[in-house]
């Protein structure tokens, strides 16, 4: 299920809610379409409302700013992305993350590759919470003199850079191969 579909399903479907849902979906889809075409920083609210075919006041009645629209996108994306099934091994879980970025490459990956500060900060927070704990014990045992905060920073930064490299240049490798590279280092 795509992020957009999850977004739409999260709203109750009463008569008034349908209008709200339709408007929010139009704004959200316009935003995603613009992310496919250009960097987040260069997107204007005017472009979003023109493409969504809504008025400025309508946009602002749903979102105070394009930053809050980005925030909602990140929340929906990361909720799905980091919702880890308990039966998955760390390698399969990491493959899930890679596959998600590959599947949503256009709009989501553009945020990663453009080094959007907000997106990277949110991604970093999620990785610290969900990915680092999977490798922490082994790393701490292997490197007892290195501060835990540095190890966490190293794991998260390395993951983001590995993901970015794979999306830009390494697609001749499967998700599993790249994850193996990541875990071996």
What would you call each of these model-derived segments?
Residues 116-161:
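Amphipathic alpha-helical packing segments from all-alpha helical-bundle domains
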Residues 53-63:
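Short hydrophobic/aromatic patch on the recognition helix
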Residues 26, 44, 58-60, 107:
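Residues in the helix-turn-helix
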Residues 44-45, 65:
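Residues that mark the N-terminal boundary/hinge immediately upstream of a DNA-recognition element
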Residues 2-7, 165-185:
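C-terminal peripheral helix-coil segments that are non-catalytic and often amphipathic
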């Amino acid at each position: 299920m795509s992020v957009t579909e999850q977004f739409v399903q999260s709203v109750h479907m009463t008569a008034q809610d349908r209008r709200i849902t339709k408007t929010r979906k139009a704004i959200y889809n316009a935003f995603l379409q613009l992310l496919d075409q250009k960097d987040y920083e260069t997107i204007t609210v005017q472009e979003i409302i023109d493409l969504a075919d809504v008025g400025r006041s309508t946009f602002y009645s749903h979102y105070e700013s394009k930053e809050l629209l980005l925030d909602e996108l990140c929340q929906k994306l990361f909720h799905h992305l980091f919702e880890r099934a308990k039966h998955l091994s760390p390698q399969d879980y990491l493959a899930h993350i890679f596959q998600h970025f590959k599947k949503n490459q256009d709009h989501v990956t553009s945020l990663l590759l453009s080094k959007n500060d907000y997106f990277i900060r949110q991604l970093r927070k999620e990785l610290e919470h969900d990915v680092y704990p999977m490798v922490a014990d082994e790393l701490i045992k292997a490197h007892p003199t290195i501060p835990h905060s540095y190890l966490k920073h190293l794991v998260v930064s390395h993951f983001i850079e590995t993901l970015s490299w794979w999306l830009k240049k390494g697609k001749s490798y499967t998700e599993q191969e790249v994850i193996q590279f990541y875990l071996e280092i």
